[in-house]
Amino acid sequence: MSCPHHYPSLTAIICCYTKTHMSKTIWLRVALPETDLSALRKEFPRCEITTETDDAIGPAQLERIDGVFTEEALPDSLVEQMPNLRWLHVTRGGVSAYLTPEVKARSIQVTGSKGIHGAVFSEFALACILALVKKLPECLQAQEQRKWQKLVPVEIEGKTLGIIGLGTAGSELGRKAKALGMRVIATKRTATPKPDYVDELGTSDFLPHLLAESDFVVLLLASVPSTFNIIGENELRMMKRSAYLINLTGGRAIEEPLLIRALKEGWIAGAALDAFARQPLPEDSELWSLPNVIITPRIAGIPSQKWPAMLPIFRENLRRFTAGEPLRNLVDKELGY
């Protein structure tokens, strides 16, 4: 079996021949730079690489596909045309959006790029915290009005940071916050030994204590059913009135109307939001107009140089897939992570 040659575009098909000469067909549904595609050709000499777009791939090609590397979720209408699909690798660490009914129902292994977004998420969280306490939104508003307004910034040293979800990103944030002199407390899904940079660590039972103690609460959760509405009215009222909520990953962790009410009525001081139940956030959402809210368009986890971080995981999993070995970052499709 061979693949026709084309120049790289938005998608690519890789026909991989294993040592037993059994072919594997991998669809690269991502916009890889030419240099990276060339490197893949050299690393996998038995693979013929050709590029196709979604519209250009015909039924005969789809039937041969064994694996897909994608940035956007695969619609079930495409998955249904790939009877041999056995592996789906995605560019994100969180994979819930990719677990469509067809993907979940079939014997398709799903792997993600978990572990590479910690630095960018942690930096973004700190940027939000510092912007809020240093009154940058108020300064920008005053600048637009050409108004010389005296404000009183607050120091973060000695303040308590509560991290809900001490995974890769939460751990990176904890390390950085501790280096800045903050007290760090956190929750984790399962009980593990406490790392040195965390002052207190617990599981879900620890959440009320974390909310009551924290000056900043950062949500770094997988968007899965077990985390939906994890922050309700009782939890918001446990927080200090001077506390800030930063939500970077759990768009459905808190209901939007409830959060709006909490912000308008002063249950908490403010929020920075990069994750929403409705994305993009609709223009008619009241969140846009609240003065104590920073809204960003789902950019917290985007690295400026993503391929150097993502490709090593894909290349290793491609090697494992063609060799019949266990895949790295394999997702439990029932749990969603």
PLM features: residue spans?
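Glycine-rich, N-terminal phosphate-binding loop of Rossmann-like dinucleotide-binding domains
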Residues: 72, 92, 219-221, 248-249, ...
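Cysteine-centered motifs
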Residues: 3, 15-16
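Phosphate-binding beta-alpha-beta segment of Rossmann-like dinucleotide-binding domains, i.e.
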Residues: 105-160, 172, 179, 189
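Rossmann-like dinucleotide-binding domain for NAD(H)/NADP(H)
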Residues: 110, 242, 248-337
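An N-terminal-biased, well-structured beta-alpha scaffold segment characteristic
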Residues: 17, 21-111, 232
